[in-house]
C-alpha cells in the first residue's frame, strides 16, 4: 500500500497481548450462550455452571487488559455486548425454560424484563464512562446491581431448588416471576452497591485473603450450589449495608463542603 508520496505503508499490526483480554471476553460470551443450549436440553446444572464461568471470566478480562496495557475502545464495547448476552439474555431464557414458561400469563414478560433491564443498566454505565461527576463511583460504589451480580441473584431460586433436592416450591412460576422482576428492578435502580474493584487489602492481611480465596475455591468445587447460594445471599444482605455506608459518605462530603 502506498501513500500520496509513493512510499509504502506497513499495515497496522495488533500485538498478540492486546488480543488476550478480548479472547477472554469472547469465551465468556460463548459460555453464556452455551448456558441457553444446556437449558434447552433440561441440563440445569450445566446451564448454571456455564453462566457462572462466564461471570468468572468477565471479572478477569478487564484486569488482564490493564495488566497487559491492552485496554481499547473495541474491548470495552465487546465487553458490554458480551455482558448483555451472558448476564441478561441467557439468564432470562434459562429462567423462562426452567419455570416462567409455566405461568398462565406474563411469564415471558418477566423474562424480558430481566433482559431489558440488564441492557438498560449497561447502557447507563457506558453513557457515564466519560462523565466527570459520578458520586457513587468516586466513593467506591456501583450504581445499581452490576450485570454479573444481577444474573447470580436471579438464579437464587434455582440454587435453592438444587440444594433442596429439587423441591417444586422453589420452581413455582409465581415465586420465580416475582423474584425475577425484583432483581430486574435492582439492576436499573440508583441504589449504591459495593464495588469489589475498589476493595484494597492491607499488606498484613494478604495471606489471610489468599487463604480465603483458596477456601472459597475448595467450597465451590465440593459444594457448588450451596457456596453460590451463600455468596448470592451475602451480596443481597450487603445491599442495605452499602446504602448505609454511602449515606455516611454523603454526610461526610456535605460536612466538608459546608461553611467552616
Q: What function would you assign to each model-found segment?
A:
Residues 1-59, 242, 260:
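Topogenic membrane-insertion module of multi-pass membrane proteins
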Residues 33-36, 53, 57, 91, ...:
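Alpha-helical transmembrane segments of polytopic integral membrane proteins
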Residues 63-72, 119-137, 188-197, 243-247:
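C-terminal ends of transmembrane helices
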Residues 34-49, 89-112, 156-176, 221-226:
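Helix-coil boundary and interhelical linker segments in multi-pass alpha-helical membrane proteins
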Residues 1-9, 139-260:
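C-terminal membrane-associated helical module and adjoining short loops/tails
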Residues 30-34, 90-92, 210-218:
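Hydrophobic, membrane-inserted alpha-helices
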Residues 14-22, 74-82, 142, 195-205:
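Short, amphipathic, aromatic/basic-enriched membrane-interface segments that mark the entry/exit
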Residues 18-25, 67-125, 157:
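Multi-pass membrane catalytic core of lipid/isoprenoid biosynthesis enzymes
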Amino acid at each position: 500500500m502506498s501513500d500520496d508520496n509513493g512510499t509504502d505503508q506497513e499495515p497496522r499490526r495488533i500485538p498478540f497481548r492486546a488480543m488476550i483480554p478480548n479472547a477472554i471476553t469472547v469465551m465468556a460470551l460463548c459460555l453464556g450462550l452455551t448456558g441457553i443450549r444446556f437449558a434447552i436440553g433440561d441440563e440445569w446444572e450445566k446451564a448454571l455452571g456455564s453462566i457462572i464461568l462466564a461471570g468468572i471470566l468477565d471479572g478477569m478480562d478487564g484486569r488482564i487488559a490493564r495488566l497487559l496495557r491492552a485496554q481499547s475502545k473495541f474491548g470495552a464495547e465487546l465487553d458490554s455486548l458480551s455482558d448483555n448476552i451472558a448476564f441478561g439474555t441467557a439468564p432470562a431464557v434459562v429462567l423462562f425454560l426452567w419455570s416462567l414458561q409455566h405461568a398462565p400469563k406474563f411469564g415471558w414478560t418477566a423474562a424480558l424484563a430481566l433482559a431489558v433491564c440488564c441492557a438498560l443498566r449497561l447502557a447507563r454505565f457506558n453513557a457515564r464512562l466519560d462523565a466527570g461527576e459520578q458520586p457513587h463511583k468516586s466513593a467506591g460504589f456501583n450504581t445499581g446491581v452490576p450485570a454479573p451480580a444481577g444474573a447470580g441473584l436471579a438464579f437464587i431460586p434455582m440454587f435453592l431448588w438444587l440444594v433442596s433436592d429439587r423441591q417444586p416450591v422453589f420452581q413455582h412460576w409465581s415465586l420465580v416471576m416475582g423474584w425475577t422482576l425484583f432483581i430486574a428492578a435492582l439492576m436499573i435502580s440508583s441504589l449504591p452497591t459495593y464495588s469489589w474493584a475498589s476493595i484494597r487489602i492491607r499488606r498484613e492481611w494478604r495471606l489471610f485473603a489468599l487463604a480465603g480465596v483458596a477456601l472459597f475455591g475448595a467450597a465451590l468445587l465440593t459444594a457448588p450450589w450451596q457456596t453460590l447460594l451463600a455468596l448470592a445471599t451475602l451480596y443481597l444482605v450487603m445491599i442495605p449495608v452499602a446504602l448505609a455506608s454511602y449515606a455516611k459518605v454523603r454526610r461526610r462530603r456535605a460536612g466538608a463542603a459546608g461553611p467552616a
